[in-house]
Amino acid sequence: MKPKKSLGQHFLSDAGILGRIADAVGISPGETVLEIGPGRGDLTRQLLHRGARVVAIEKDTGLAAELMGEGRGKREEGNVTVIEGDALRVDWHSVVASTLPSSRFPPPRFSVVGNIPYNITSPLLEKALTPPLPRVIVFLVQKEVADRIASPPGSRIYGALSVGIQAACRVEKLFTVKAGAFRPSPKVDSAVIRLTPLAQPLVPVEQAGAFRRFVVACFSQRRKQLRNAVAGAVGREPAVVADALRALGFDPTLRPERLAPADFARLLIWSDQL
């Protein structure tokens, strides 16, 4: 089937690259892997060959039918469940649980993997990082986005996206995939990122939304000094904020991009005490 531009489809069929993506998940035999946008099933086969039980969510009606019917999934001893639907709307945990035998114990954590359409990368990342978190997330995304996610403090591309994800996960940018590997070729290169949720995230689950809003506000005018950026985020006078920052051990004249994710977590705790 031809890729649909409306769905942002760019098919990847290079077995070597797909194998590296599947290896990055670190699959244990029998582990459930949720695949976002399986397309023609090329990555699906690689996951199956490594012993995964695959739950695949496919929005394209034709591709979903192919995978459910005479497509590649049915030839793998029933270890594929295809869900036709929008991955942004489907309840991932419910569909995974529905494929498991009934048990009085909570279902084990699953992994998430996918070749992600560029136009829905941000909301998919947000959904993937909504608790309860997967064991690991491996996404093929636009290289520019991968660079931003993995960028360290002080980098010109370090920002709210970097802080938000690094506060919850260990981030690894694994390798680049050139545009020419896809059909049709996108205009830019892609990269594979692996996000491993931290055993102890920097911010408690119940404060994740507040943390995200606070960090976005601090970076909304990234050239401002820290005292002004934080003052705008918490609604206080810059002079008052500057004194508080000094008391916390921060230089109020720094730019927000100089702070590590743990520093933003400390500032959020301070702001809650105002």
Model-predicted regions and their roles:
Residues 215-274:
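C-terminal lobe and adjacent flexible extensions of AdoMet/dcAdoMet transferase-like proteins
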Residues 1-101, 105-217, 246, 257, ...:
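Catalytic cores of RNA-modifying enzymes
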